[in-house]
A protein has these predicted regions:
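Rhodanese-like catalytic fold shared by cysteine-dependent sulfurtransferases
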Residues: 2-8, 12-40, 49-81, 90-127
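Structural scaffold elements adjacent to functional motifs in cytosolic proteins
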Residues: 42-44
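Short, surface-exposed ligand- or partner-binding patches at beta-edge/loop junctions that are enriched
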Residues: 85
């Protein structure tokens, strides 16, 4: 019993010492609720062509593959809340990691990207 208690205590201590990245992966329903919150900045990290085909309303385009992504995020407020997405969740996951490495503290990634977003019936806008 003492060994079990010691293991539990050790696990809790280690969990408390782990670094928090600030990133949270959300499904499309949770992501929809997050982007509706006041003050949340929505970032689309797809290409300009993909963005033009349809994007989440209010999203700002910062192309992850442009070669200028790090410079563009350097101009953003690192303490703001960001909801980040792409086509499938791959690029946005990489973008979130890059943002974390740059010191961003409150970043949300949409799992499944606009593919899952559209399949779930959420709207995409063109403008």
């Amino acid at each position: 019993m003492k060994k079990v208690m010691a293991l539990i205590a050790s696990a809790l201590l280690l969990a408390g010492c782990s670094s928090s990245t600030g990133a949270i992966d959300l499904g499309v329903t949770e992501f929809s609720a997050k982007v509706a919150e006041a003050g949340v900045i929505t970032l689309d990290v797809r290409t300009p062509g993909e963005f033009a085909e349809g994007h989440v309303e209010g999203a700002r385009l910062i192309d992850f593959q442009s070669g200028n992504f790090e410079n563009e995020i350097a101009a953003l407020d690192k303490n703001a809340t960001y909801a980040v997405y792409c086509r499938s969740g791959n690029r946005s996951g990489q973008a979130v990691k890059t943002m974390q490495d740059a010191g961003f503290t409150n970043v949300f990634n949409m799992n499944g990207g606009v593919i899952d977003w559209a399949n779930a019936g959420f709207p995409l806008v063109k403008n």
